[in-house]
Swiss-Prot record:
It is found in: Cytoplasm. GO terms for molecular function: DNA binding. InterPro entries: Integrase-like_N (IPR017856), TACO1_YebC-like_2nd/3rd_dom (IPR048300), TACO1_YebC_N (IPR049083), Transcrip_reg_TACO1-like (IPR002876), Transcrip_reg_TACO1-like_dom3 (IPR026564), YebC-like (IPR029072). The keyword Iron-sulfur does not apply. One of its GO terms (cellular component) is cytosol. Keywords: Cytoplasm, DNA-binding, Transcription, Transcription regulation. Belongs to the TACO1 family. It comes from the Bacteria. This is Probable transcriptional regulatory protein Tbd_2215. Disulfide bonds: none annotated. It holds the Pfam family Transcrip_reg. GO terms for biological process: regulation of DNA-templated transcription. NCBIfam families: PRK00110.1, PRK12378.1, YebC/PmpR family DNA-binding transcriptional regulator.
Length: 243
């Protein structure tokens, strides 16, 4: 089914993230450290680490930072012990919000996340309260103008789960969230001459809710507050906000 506002929504989320570029390196270093801790320091044997390094390089994260983050993850260098944590809640009009964190103090993090919700008119929920409204997927988005037929052929041959043409001309390719499966499809598309505008393993909303006016402005404040927290890695919502 075509997603009428999918491309605009993705661009909006990326725009929010780009506006906070001062935090990008910190988030990337945390993800590399945790990936190395969980799966080992060899990118060839650790797909999550490989993807994290690739993302770091795309953001011009210095090589020394990458190498030191890996060493902290494997214990070769002393470092902070981060844990993964996910929190769920509701924004304006009951829209769904999921917040993924890497933290060394869950007590602090849960208090900060709850405060960000409540201060701006949202509320934090219990585990699982909105998770069913999202699907864990590999998501590759091609900008408007790509050939749907060529994308479909390359993606499905490489094992993609679905290819979705959107009303705005962008094309969304969905894969398994398994990093190896995701990489295989991404590489096949690149080999076919396509350059993904977005390529990530993410939580994709099953349905979206458009907000406008004051509701959109209030929702933006909730998202900004959550994304400004040091422990927050990703914020997902099914809200669609105007540009």
């Amino acid at each position: 089914m075509a997603g009428h506002s999918k491309w605009a929504n993705i661009q909006h989320r990326k725009g929010r993230q780009d506006a906070k570029r001062g935090k990008i390196f910190t988030k990337l270093i945390k993800e590399i450290t945790v990936a190395a801790k969980m799966g080992g320091g060899d990118p060839a044997m650790n797909p999550r680490l490989r993807l994290a390094i690739e993302k770091g390089k795309a953001e011009s994260l210095p090589k020394d930072n990458i190498e030191n983050a890996i060493k902290r993850g494997t214990g070769q260098l002393e470092g902070v012990n981060y844990e993964e944590a996910r929190y769920e809640g509701y924004g304006i009009g009951g829209v769904a919000v999921m917040v993924d964190c890497l933290t060394d103090n869950k007590t602090r993090t849960v208090a900060d996340v709850r405060h960000a919700f409540t201060k701006h008119g949202g509320n934090m929920g219990t585990d699982g309260c909105v998770a069913f409204q999202f699907k864990h997927v590999g998501q590759i988005v091609l900008e408007p103008g790509a050939s749907e037929e060529a994308v479909m052929e390359a993606a499905l041959d490489a094992g993609a789960d679905d290819v979705i043409p959107n009303d705005d001309g962008s094309i969304e390719v969905l894969t398994s969230p398994d990093p190896k499966a995701f990489e295989a499809v991404k590489e096949a598309l690149e080999k076919a001459g396509f350059k993904p505008a977005v390529a990530e393993i993410t939580m994709r909303p099953e349905a979206e809710t458009e907000l406008a006016g004051d509701d959109a402005a209030k929702m933006q404040k909730i998202l900004d507050a959550l994304e400004s927290l040091d422990d927050v890695q990703e914020v997902y919502t099914n809200a669609v906000l105007p540009d």
